[in-house]
Amino acid sequence: MEETNQFKAIDSRFVYISISSIEAIKEFVSTVTNFACDATLCSGRYIVDAKSIMGVFSLDATKPIKMVLEVGRNGVDDRDALCDAIDKFIVD
């Protein structure tokens, strides 16, 4: 009987973003929801879905926020396109 590996290696990428106003948060979430990849925001001990406006509003926006990007469940890898679309929010 041959064993199969049920777990796939996760290819994660991350960038830091700055979204310091209500309008910026609305624009950011609206843009991110148009992409298939999974996007998570990490700030301190909090982790939220970047496609959730309520989740994003709950984070401390006074500091850069780490955004982790992974290929979506459908297998579409549009992470580079997402980074291009949110370029104005990305900080070094």
Give the label of every model feature segment.
Residues 9-18:
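Short glycine-/aliphatic-rich beta-strand segments at the starts of folded cytosolic domains
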Residues 18-20, 33, 40:
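N-terminal intrinsically disordered, cationic/polar leader segments
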Residues 19, 43, 73:
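Conserved residues at beta->alpha junctions
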Residues 22-25, 50:
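Structural motif corresponding to alpha-helix initiation and N-cap regions
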Residues 27-35, 85, 89:
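Generic non-transmembrane alpha-helical segments
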Residues 64-92:
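C-terminal structural segments of small proteins and small subunits
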